[in-house]
Amino acid sequence: MNTIIKNLLFCFMLLILSACDEQNKTTNKETELVPKSAIEQINRQISEVPEDVGVHYYGLEQNLQRYSPLTQVNDGNVHQLKPSWVLSLGDNRGQQTQPLVINGVMYITSHNATYAVDARSGRQIWKSIIQYPAETLTCCGVTNRGATWYDDVLYRATPDNRLLALNPKDGKTIWEKRTAEIEFGYSMTSAPLVANNVVITGVAGGEFGARGFLDGWDPKTGEHLWRFHTIPKPGEKGSESWQGDEWEHGGGPTWLIGSYDKELDLVYWGVGNKSPWNMREGAKDNLYTQSMLAIRPKTGELIWHYQFTPNDGFDYDAVNDPILTEIEVDGKQRKVLIQANRNGFFYVLDRSNGKLLRANKFVDKVTWADGIDIETGRPIISERVKNMIKTGETTEIWPSAFGGKNLAPMSYSPTTGLAYANTFNIGWYYTPVKQEYKKGVFYVGAKFEWILPDEPKGYLKAID
């Protein structure tokens, strides 16, 4: 955890001290928001922490736990926190990025720029503009979710499918590589992951029928090392789970970052929806959509997979954060992967082999399945869904594509042993329809109407 302490300590103390010293006014521009005495106190506190630490990773660490051991901010003083500075990114698009903080510099991404900001003052150090074609296709809003730091280089993706290596001192591009073409619906929104000296990237585009993949890149040169397609072509393992030429436009996007276990040397990455969504009688499982993949970072070799929702019809993307931890299961300490899936079930997998250990509802209302069979690992499809597949009738389904949980990150505390997740309480009326593939057009094969309950539509939940 020492890789996050220095800069998080600074940020937390900055907020607390600015609140506590609210009465101390100053006209000095450098300390307009925080008194000089507070700055000196912060600097004294962080001086004991090594200079080379920071928030280097999306999710704070590569296990994606988002856990901080800091205790200064607690339920007794959290109400004192107030903003110390505000920085406008000059854009009205959604901001979903997680900043990085390295040696007092905060690195922030938006869809069309990368920023370096002095974390103490909010002063912009540099801004690197990203230009991309207006006709770039995106499913659900133009956004970017962050960058990653490795060996003194900043890596980020762009909406038009470029991977950039940036010099963190001035924001200039060291190298850039294109991963896919925009006319097929591909885009890139996630932060890259660096594992065993390989930069790994995923793509969005499942709603357009874009065939998903993961790429591995050399961090020094940008050389393309490997590609793993999430939809196998005929003759490849898993191709028997598709019919005819469905695989060509089968979806399987990889639009959120994965996690990494250095000891096992495995990258864990979730795969999203199949295209189109609609479920049909006689349809097969459609691997590796709605699955968790364990991949060797040097080669892209698939070691194991677990499919959460075979032949999914409801856009239950399995890309939600795969958090890594160790817990006791049936009296034995196990290295596990946990995920709050969009389909409304919370999963615990043995991350060495993909074996399902636990699966329970974490939202109140789940109607698409009656449960998960622990022996087979497969969902027990409800009678209402079986009838919908047979008749094509409009059916009330819970949860909706918003999921039991969507892309908002979950966290895990090894202190409490609990996971903390933002959850949804939204259903939909769903009708499967036939649809032919057309390049650059939404390819979902469904009509739907949201069901918004009178009671709260979302909750923060703690999950054992």
What are these regions (language model features)?
Residues 16-19:
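C-terminal motif of bacterial Sec signal peptides marking the signal peptidase cleavage site
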